[in-house]
Amino acid sequence: MTLKTIRGKALMGAALCATMLTFSGQAFADAELKIFVSSQHQPDIWRKALDQYEAKTPGVKVVIETGGNTSEMQAQYLNTVMSAKDSSLDVLMLDVIRPAQFATAGWTSDFSGKDLSAYLPTYAEANTVNGKIVALPAFADSMFLYYRKDLLDKYGIKPPTTWDELKEASKKVMEGEKNPELQGLSFQGKAIEGAVCTFLLPYWSEGKSLVENGKLNFDNKAAVDSLKLWKSFVDDGISKKNISEVATDDTRKEFQAGKVLFAVNWSYAWTHFQGKESQVNDKVGVARLPAVKGGEQTTCLGGWEFGVSAYSKQQDEAKKLVEYLSSQDVSKFMAINAALLPTYAALYKDADVTKTIPWFADALPVVETAKARPVTPRYNEVSETIRTTVNGVLAGVMTPEDGAKQMESRLRRVLR
């Protein structure tokens, strides 16, 4: 993995000043903190928030370290650092599925006495392990359906509410456009964390759960249906033949280049779609993900958290920094400047936020009802089982029926 250190002194607006009055307090003496930030989630914008923190907290310098374009790559790196009890990292940005793992391993410090009631309940729950607060929310997230608003309008099509409707819409537009580079749908088929959500979306839509009370609750029919659905997009020519090689940011890049009609992706993609180099600027709509026929529309809960390394030699300074980064003012700043969904309900009605990103006004119900992936200390094994199976089916290595059978067998060994 290639790692890089980002330093900068870009100035922020006044949006964070009120927060800094709270967090300036007594200065720490010559403390340099290192924070690991997901390279996919706007480290340049986080840098601006950190610059303001430095400006108001004399004696504290913060260095950003990034690495890895997927949740798995980042987790692999952090697992190596934490297993070695390395003190070089003070603050860790963790995928919402990781706090339980890291806390169980003894890799994060607790935030004793912290009140999480101001945050969205889902994230308060995700960061509480065995009654202890082990991390604080960085930003919320859910999967959404991005679509080419201009093309749907051109062909008189409404945003689809079922996957069957999406197929029909894709066929109509693709036939009409006669553009061999235009895909109907892009989603995550590579053996990454996104493929876990790929599998669960139709599975959940049938009203099924995967784990209950820590025990496997596998529904074979729903699993086969899910795998068949995704494979059918490839077989019907709606999705590219090598979808098994497509990761989250590949979907984002292809949609941004104007080569995709519908895309399943997270909120971070919005800012990229509206950028100067985007081919779809002002042509993008956002909707809830479709349902299977007769099922419910549902989505996969995402989001990232900030934890303090148990091996940091600057515990107080690191916790102060995390309190700041998890504050409502920083959450608002990141929503406006990076299109990262807030972890505070009030910000979804904030005039400054909705003026900049209007669709955020309708995003709260989606985030609040999003379903979480299984929470278990053995999540890595659960994830690896699901994503490799999805990838194998999409690559044509196994049938949906064989994939579901193999998935159940492997999961039963993990979740006994």
From Swiss-Prot:
Pfam families in UniProt: SBP_bac_1
Signal sequence annotation: 1-29
Gene Ontology cellular component annotations, sorted alphabetically: periplasmic space
Location relative to the cell: Periplasm
Summary of the function given for this chain in its UniProt record: Part of the ABC transporter complex SmoEFGH involved in sulfoquinovosyl glycerol (SQGro) uptake. Binds sulfoquinovosyl glycerol (SQGro). Can also bind sulfoquinovose (SQ), methyl alpha-sulfoquinovoside (SQMe) and a short-chain derivative of sulfoquinovosyl diacylglycerol (SQDG). Cannot bind D-glucose and D-glucuronic acid.
Annotated PANTHER family: ABC TRANSPORTER PERIPLASMIC-BINDING PROTEIN YCJN-RELATED, ARABINOSE-BINDING PROTEIN-RELATED
Name recorded for this polypeptide: Sulfoquinovosyl glycerol-binding protein SmoF
Source organism of the structure: Agrobacterium fabrum (strain C58 / ATCC 33970) (Agrobacterium tumefaciens (strain C58))
